[in-house]
Amino acid sequence: MKRSLLALALVAVLPFAAQADDKLSYSYVEADYVNLDGDADGYGLRGAFEFGDSGFYGLGGWRTAEIDGTNIDVDQWELGVGYAHGISPNADLISELAYDKVDVEGFDEDGYRASVGVRGSFSPNFEGIAKASYVDSDDTDGDFVGTLGAQYKFTQTWGVVGEAEFADGGELYTVGLRASF
């Protein structure tokens, strides 16, 4: 039901979208709805900040979800750095390294994520990302994660984002609103 309402809201505002800029921005704040494997719902905040024209950017995020039918919360936060290397006027090769922390009802796990991917602008209003990551932590074996995402920009500042992460242990879906600057 929640997904249907989100999809309906997105479709309703698409005709009113203004022309947006096609420059890829690595400075943004974002609020997301989070769905973990269809078994947990929650919300999150993410952001990034470009360090001038160097190609480097800092990134961070926090999300929380409650497992359906329980009072068990899953909290995660990450802090890291990334680098974007232009491979064409509308596409960047990106690499990221981040520290991750996950807390499930008092069980804390520290880890890291190393990612490489491509982010590109398909049109002035639409961009996509494909990323491969290796994630490892204290008490678990490492895992590879594939990420596919997109952003539809209403204006140079505002856009709607969606992302799906696929791993051996499950999927994570996010839909949110992004303000780029």
Where do the language-model regions lie?
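Outer-membrane beta-barrel proteins
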Residues: K2-F181
